[in-house]
Regions:
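C-terminal structural segment of proteins
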Residues: 1-270
């Protein structure tokens, strides 16, 4: 089946084109989309591209930073204001992938990909769509209805400004280092002292990145010591149904999640 490609200079025009194409996909970096096309994915009939510079911008907005959806992992690593996200971007594939893979594309990545989105979820990020005039959608809500948002163009992702890179902790659990697909990823944002206000997110433990709400509640007010995090580790997978796939079983994911969460919270190997 032939694929129609449209290129627009304005993000508003691109958004209209994508919304009117029932078989359309937006082209960001193409690291996953081109694989689907090469595998003859029959659900894709139209590709919409956009060259609007707004997609490549990183700008300050008060106490938050707006990261354009077209910003690549390599650009994240090179941006001083985004130093707290550089370790996460660094584990996304190899140099060739990082030079193409975009923040917006990662939002739609299916397991075993989407590690960067896991970190964004821990950071309480929000998503801004083209034409929303400053309004944004919490990332958690976006992920809950992600399948129905492919017809909209993401303009940027909003994250809090973090001056201490150690406040965001991240681990990618893989059998093939350093570039293997993750069987699990864990991100923890520790904005306060101890576990106060801690946010924990898992990747590849559900169809989309997901919060570890029970572990967060158990950690509230606790110290980041072995004794203080004990209840959080017991609740590490409470309320979750990890998948069984070619990378790991549900049982294995439940067994290793507390181990890696413990190391992350104690800052071991960070």
């Amino acid at each position: 089946m032939p694929v129609h490609v449209e290129t627009h200079a304005n993000i508003s025009d691109a958004a209209r084109a994508l919304s009117s194409a029932r078989d359309g996909r937006f082209f960001g970096g193409g690291t996953l989309l081109m694989r689907a096309l090469n595998e003859a994915d029959q659900s894709i009939g139209t590709i919409v591209r956009c060259t609007d510079p707004v997609l490549r911008q990183v700008r300050s907005e008060g106490d938050r930073i707006a990261i354009g959806a077209g910003v690549t992992m390599a650009e994240i690593m090179a941006n001083r204001d985004l130093a707290f996200l550089a370790p996460v971007a660094r584990i996304i594939g190899g140099p060739a992938v990082r030079s193409a893979a975009t923040v917006g594309g990662n939002l739609f990545a299916e397991p075993p990909y989407g590690d960067f989105t896991t970190a964004l979820l821990a950071l309480d990020a929000s998503v801004r769509f083209a034409g929303e005039s400053g309004q944004s959608t919490p990332l958690q809500d976006f992920l809950r209805d992600r399948a129905n948002r492919r017809g909209r163009v993401v303009e940027s992702v909003m994250v809090p400004r973090i001056t201490d890179p150690k406040a965001l902790r991240f681990v990618k659990v893989t059998r093939v280092k350093p570039k293997g697909a993750a069987l699990m990823s864990i991100a923890a944002w520790l904005p306060g002292s101890g576990g106060r206000g801690c946010r924990i997110a898992y990747g590849n433990m559900a169809p989309t990145p997901v919060r570890a709400a029970a572990a967060e509640r158990a950690l509230e007010g606790a110290s980041l010591s072995e004794q203080g995090i004990a209840r959080a580790l017991q609740a590490a997978t409470e309320g979750l149904t990890p998948p069984t796939d070619m990378f790991a079983s549900e049982w294995y994911r439940r067994e290793v999640a507390p181990v890696h969460l413990k190391r992350l919270l104690l800052g071991q190997g960070q």
